[in-house]
Amino acid sequence: MPSVRTEDRVSREVSITRLFDAPRELVFRCFTDAEHIATWWGPEGFTAPECASDPRPGGKLRIVMRGPDGAEFPVDATYLEVEAPTRLVIESNAVGPDGAVLLEAINTVTLVERDGATEVTVHARATALVSEAAAMLVGMDAGWTQSLQCLDDVLTGAVDRQFVIMRVFDAPRQVVFRAWTDPEQLQHWWGPKGFSLTIDEIDVRPGGTWRFTMHGPDGVDYPNVSRYEVVDAPRRLVFMHSGEGVTAEDPAFRSTVTFDDMGGTTVLTMRAVFETAAARDLVQEKYHALEGGNETLDRLGEYLDTR
């Protein structure tokens, strides 16, 4: 590895806490068992086709992450501390194509039992060893946040009953969050291509209601009602969504929209979770929901470009 000037080294720390509705022993195994790790490790859209784990002090952990574009990102790690089922300390290295270490990190994972659920806190301190790797630090917060969401999806069985769409917008997350909550801005982009929007009511607070009608290009109207459960500006929105009424033909779903800062740009992840896989499939067949969601975010991107 080439020598590195001290001034090239850049460090960053992140700390993320997440509550999982699962026993602590199971969650701990998800962090240490290779078969479990492979089901959730990595940001949204990534897979882990290669994973080997030896969870003991001095034992090795190797993960090869594969991005949506097929690019692979090897991670070589060593377990420093293993206290089942309460604590892990892992030293990890991100490796470049030539085998050189680009980034090194100390990751501390603590697991606390909370009335049958498990509170997980991940504290990561990473140092870029070369200036070219400094950009990797920018996405560390978003990467861990999305990875833990993927773990939650696995633990709750949501993988087969949800839609997930992710985009990167060249705008600060405060601006993107505002576009989701300001009725004047929503008028400019909400809905698939060719749709327009009438907002009858919007009260962006926990317990508040958003009542609106989407007007299709064929003249068909689609009444909608959403009720906000979480409003955490500018990080997250959670709302229950339904049409005119919840029926077997029009099932409700819970939408979670996260806004992760990545060096002044925003990684937006939109997740819609249904009660069953059949309900998800029905909405996809009837409304082409996935295509509509992608077109909606296309319109959001076009709108933000004009700001």
Question: What role is predicted for each listed range?
Answer:
Residues M1-T47, D153, G157-S196:
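Hydrophobic ligand-binding cavity/cleft-lining segments
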Residues D8-V10, P55, D69-F73, G99-L103, ...:
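A generic structural micro-feature
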Residues R18, E50-C51, V75-E81, E104-E113, ...:
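Hydrophobic/aromatic beta-strand elements that line small-molecule binding cavities or substrate pockets
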Residues R24, R56, L80-R87, T110-E119, ...:
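A short, structured loop/turn motif at beta-sheet edges
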Residues V27, I37, L61-I63, Y79, ...:
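Hydrophobic pocket/interface hotspot
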Residues P49-N93, T198-S242:
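Glycine-rich portal/gate segments that line the openings of hydrophobic small-molecule binding cavities
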Residues V89-E91, P97-T145, M240, E244-N294:
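Beta-strand/loop substructures that line and gate deep hydrophobic ligand-binding cavities in soluble
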Residues L151-V159, E302-R307:
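Surface-exposed helix-capping loop/turn segments at secondary-structure junctions
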